[in-house]
Swiss-Prot record:
GO annotation (BP), single: antibiotic biosynthetic process
Keyword Protein biosynthesis tagged: no
Listed cofactors: FAD
Pathway(s) served: Antibiotic biosynthesis
GO function terms (MF aspect): monooxygenase activity
Keyword terms of this UniProt record: Antibiotic biosynthesis, FAD, Flavoprotein, Monooxygenase, NADP, Oxidoreductase
Assigned EC number: 1.14.13.-
Catalysis performed (reactions): CMP-5'-(3-aminopropyl)phosphonate + NADPH + O2 = CMP-5'-(N-hydroxy-3-aminopropyl)phosphonate + NADP(+) + H2O
Protein name as it appears in the record: CMP-5'-(3-aminopropyl)phosphonate hydroxylase
Source species, domain of life: Bacteria
Function according to Swiss-Prot or TrEMBL: Hydroxylase involved in the biosynthesis of the phosphonate antibiotic FR-900098, a potent antimalarial agent that acts as an inhibitor of 1-deoxy-D-xylulose 5-phosphate reductoisomerase (DXR), the first enzyme in the nonmevalonate pathway for isoprenoid biosynthesis. Catalyzes the N-hydroxylation of CMP-5'-3-aminopropylphosphonate (CMP-5'-3APn) to CMP-5'-(N-hydroxy-3-aminopropyl)phosphonate (CMP-5'-H3APn). Cannot use CMP-5'-N-acetyl-3-aminopropylphosphonate (CMP-5'-Ac3APn) as a substrate.
Amino acid sequence: MTHYATVICGGGPAGVSAVVAAAVQGRLEEFLDRGVLLVEATGRAGSGSIPHYGIRANSLGSAFLECLDGPAGSGLLAGLADSAEARELRGWADEYPPLPVVGAFLTLVGERVVDALRRHPRCDALLGHRVVEVRTGPERATVLLSGPDGELSHTGDRVLLTMGGRERTELAPDALAALVERRPGLRVLSSGEVITDPSWHPDAASPHRALGSIAVLGGAHSAWAVAAHLARLARAGWFAGPVEVTVVERRLPPIFYFSAAEARAEGYRWDEADVCGPSGRVHRFGGLRGPARELARQVMGLAAEKAPDGFGQVVLDGPWTAEALEAAVGDADLVITALGYDARLPRLLGADGRELELARPRGAVDTGRDGLPGLAAGGRAERLVMYGLGAGLVPSEETGGEPGYRGRLDGVWVYQHDIGAVILRALLANDRTEDGR
């Protein structure tokens, strides 16, 4: 058993970004000298599931390359700017790149992080190891791992939980299951299944081409991103015949604009609480971007280009019961759920061995503005720090953002910069720096 200042559980975009953020801040040596262990269940760090997503990013290609500037670009990530992966991504600098292109670059970043950790005498990276349990205590936390050679444990002053998200596929109280009972033969897929399944690729000879009506449940980016993918297929003549695609949501989607003047010129209705004070952007964090934004603007009549025939939206602002959903989805052959994510977590125990119940005031884990998760019984979970898909931080004066946004901050750029700075401060606040091995 080895002791580290920080144990990072999960080596996807969020987990790796903790190390990248330290480099961006010019504090990598300070961070690593305290001792850092990275644990990743797969054999690859940095990109998570991103290489398998058949859709476009919601950030410009240039945003993913900003980590190559400044201290990180001359140190941890030196030379990556000349890689084939970076050059391909640079070709999308002013566009929204395909996520497999982003994933290839993030995999390179992950390789650099793993190499840096393995070369440092007080750090390590364990790939192919699964985090089973984290037991917290007043002085340290113990992390139980399962790997090729069995179980092993390490301890940390802080445990950073960045294990990705688990997609929600049901509505309370079991409304989707009840809908399927009312509509025998109705198929239900998650958005993740659609965007990772090769049978939804433009070149695929797929039975999905025969679909005539599809409903997408959810009004955030994942829902409109799936709808935008379907729109691309429809415009290419992929479907065997006319197809209707309806996004069912609780409210009209928030649209990102660079300024209030731009939003006003298009006739988009917004509130002062939707404007980020420091940047002046409308729906800076909560707004749709990329192909999802363009389709939503077309459906809402804000864009010059029209949406494909049959594409529309239904606002279902009351309870999402089976009866209400049945009316909203009409005669759909397929329902695609895009209902958000919950944080993927290991078993969490307190010092007394009892399971820790984290606070979830709005459904997602409450990590506040500083990444320190709250407990359902009150107070904070000792020794734990969290962020990432399903557990993002809420906006603060430090991160900026629109005051009216009640969601979570997610995305590679904010992981490496604004959120990364907040998380790094939480990890370095620990006063234990001696070698506890």
